[in-house]
Amino acid sequence: MSKKRVYELARELGIDNKELISRLEKLGIAVKSHSGTLEDSEVDRVTKEFHARGSREMVEQRIKTTVIRRRAVRVPEKEAVLEKVPVEMEKEMGKALPEEVPEKIAPSRETPPAKVVKPRPVVPEKKIPAAGEKPLAPPEKPAEPVAPPIAEILKQEKIQPPEKFAEEPLKKPAVIEPEKAAAAPKAVPGEAKPLPRTERVQEQGKPVPGRKEGRTPVSRRPAETRFPAKPAPQPEMARKQVVAAAPGRAVPQEKGAPKTEAEKPRKKIKLPDETRKGEQIPARKKTVLKKGPEKTDFRGTLEEEIIERAVRPPRWKEEKKAAPVKMKKTEITVPKAIKRRIRVGEAITVGDLAKKMGVKAGEVINKLMRMGLMATINQSIDFDAASLIATEFEYQVEPAGMEYDESMFKVESSVENLKPRAPVVTIMGHVDHGKTSLLDAIRKTRVTEGEAGGITQAIGAYRVNLKGREIVFLDTPGHEAFTAMRARGAQVTDIVVLVVAADDGVMDQTVEAINHSKIAGVPIIVAINKIDKPEADPGRIKQALTEYELVPEEWGGDTIFSEVSAKQKIGIEELLELILLQADVLELKADPDRPARGVVIEARLDRGRGPVATVLIQEGTLHEGDAFVSKTEYGRVRAMNDDQGRRIKEAGPATPVEVIGFSRVPQASAEFNAVEDEKKARSIGDYWMRKEREKELSATSKITLEQLYEKMKEGVKELNVILRADVQGSLEALSDALTKLSTDDIKLKVIHGSTGAITETDVMLASASNAIIIGFNVRPDARVAEIAEAEGVDIKLYDIIYNVIADVRAAMEGLLEPEYREVVLGRAEVRDLFRVPKVGTVAGSFVIDGKVTRKANVKLVRDGVVVFDGKIGSLKRFKDDVKEVLSGFECGIGIEGFNDLRMGDMIEAYINEKVERKL
């Protein structure tokens, strides 16, 4: 049994492989692909089912698309008429067409007319019969037909129909309306397979059925031209006619075949009675062909029609030539004015800005470069730069609205809820003037004895009870490195106690503390300390402070002065009374019922408890379990301790408290606010974190072309440092102090700084960035020390800030290139010249002062002008080579590479001495 592949059967049926596979699956025939094989029984089953359902599906599909429907309308009528016309002609003329003609006509390869059923041109090798009909025997010669030449077709002069056809009384079918043309197939028996292309016959001026109004139909041929000059293809009409009359061919449809849905007429069309009889069809076809002279679109006689089809191009090619598709240029859509506004925060990346404006990032970068600003697609630019760039693209930039602001935490308290609170007093002054000792005397403690170097290096908050009243003291460092701490203390305090040593006088940090207090608008009480010393002179101190507008009350001013001795406990009670008196004048009050608000005084990372911060509550009451936010950090109060280390449940206004529960170590001087829940706290913290990140990106990426060139030209060296400190305030002080050591030749860069112990991450970062690690009041564990030694990372540990600054300064000086200084050794006068073969000119010289050495450099000076700078080639005394010649002796001096010596020249001997540079 022969087998047939799926694609072969699909080609015979004129449908796609996918469609045939789908039909096979519906019939229960399993195939894997288009190259699968089918048995003969399966082939018969598929073909029967195809012809039983194919026409119905084709009609349903043709109704959906008008162009396809027009093709289907003319197929049955054309084929039926072409089948009958040769038979009538054979009877009249007594001569049948040659049998060889259909064998020589090539089938037309044209676009299939439908999607559901795609008919294929008549293939001579095999004809698929209709459903319920036995297949006829194939022709003896199944070879591929070849189209005959046009000249051979023209020789058949009697192929034109006789005039008798025009005399038959068929008037209605003479002019076929477009609507009636669709119903014409009813008179023709059902056919197994429609031909692929049909000719549209219509009157000029009438629209094609189904075509949209307003579209001009493409003309096939000008009305006045019988034979178009266009080249063309296969003679389709001739093929249809001769194939229909050729003997031995399979007839497309027998009388007994069932009618398909394609042959059913539309309801609004009434066909003439003549169409019910098959014998009337030839006369109708003949009438259609003979009506040509009355219609402007008629093709002429059959012979002319054959010639025209032979030389005319296909309709689809004609349409392409007649109506070429014009490619439209891409139109740039311009948004409306209301949409040409973008919202930008404090910083935005170049890519995000380009996306908001709907332009390419490269165009934005090009604009930035023209402005002299170097930036990549991922770098950030500030709001001003973004505004300038957006203006270039005709966009308006609006600042993005703040989601959160400090003002949202400000709550107006009613006067009834305000209650008196304790004053906050900050002790300020120069280093080693006795600030902490004075506070120890007040608190009756010994804090000074436990401080490294006897100096305060962190801000502290304490609460003192005096005669039933409380005073909160803030102790600030006096060292020059702790300027930020002193400024922070002045901003949160009510009263400043300025401590000045009676034996030392007004110093730099004393003046700085005065300025901080004036900026904060805080009243100042001057405490003259160390009056117990013999060299103490309080009057001199008062006189010096008048230069800074601090005039004692006894001198007619408004500044309170108090003389104390912290070591001898002299004048402590009087000082406290003056503080309370000043507090009464200020009438300090706060609302304890509102949500807590305060400021972070100090923060550190505790190994066992995590981030810990000293917070001074200014308003409201903070309870254990409250959610809070401090700028970028947030959390929930897990525990609170007072200044004595005791656990407390709540803290009211003017209370220093140690808070545990931060997400990270907060920034010193940051605001502290209690919120409704932790979710809101997290949202606010994340928002401020994004804002800080935008600022950092904007600051790091903002570099102009000029700055880039200068930086490359300078070749500045950098010393990278990683800082670790016990508390946040000390970390800030260290960072500021070290950064100030930078010069034009060497820069110190703090690449990372945090609180807590030195970790492995710090060591790996230092190794990658070639940095040193400085630990202040912290130490690494054994494991970290081993890793640092293996990586070659230098870890420096300190507990006094003086030593940190001194060592870092020395390290920076070691990176500086040394300077070279000329040191003149002596001078010699040329008094005679000697010409020595193979050596050159030797100057007979007399050493005037100093000495001339063999390895020294020399300068030849003539008339006060340096003529040559080089080295001594030879130094002789008489005939002996010597290392040096002292003043008052004669010698012979030869200079390397120079012989133009003259009498009276001066020879200066010198050396370049290396001098280490200092910062």
From Swiss-Prot:
Show the segment(s) annotated as G3.
475-478
Please tell me one Gene Ontology term that the record gives under cellular component. Answer: cytosol
Could you tell me the keywords of this UniProt record? Cytoplasm, GTP-binding, Initiation factor, Nucleotide-binding, Protein biosynthesis
Tell me where in or outside the cell this protein is found. Cytoplasm
Ranges of biased composition (kind: Low complexity): 172-193
**Which superkingdom is the protein from?**
Bacteria
One of the entry's Gene Ontology molecular-function terms is: GTP binding
Instruction: Answer whether the UniProt record assigns the keyword Mitochondrion to this protein.
Output: no
Q: Which InterPro entries match?
A: EF-G-like_DII (IPR053905), IF2_II (IPR044145), IF2_N (IPR006847), P-loop_NTPase (IPR027417), Small_GTP-bd (IPR005225), T_Tr_GTP-bd_dom (IPR000795), TF_IF2_bacterial-like (IPR000178), TIF_IF2 (IPR015760)
Start-end of Basic and acidic residues biased regions: 93-107, 158-171, 194-203, 256-279
Region annotation (G2) ranges = 454-458
Functional summary from the UniProt entry:
One of the essential components for the initiation of protein synthesis. Protects formylmethionyl-tRNA from spontaneous hydrolysis and promotes its binding to the 30S ribosomal subunits. Also involved in the hydrolysis of GTP during the formation of the 70S ribosomal complex.
Protein's name in the database: Translation initiation factor IF-2
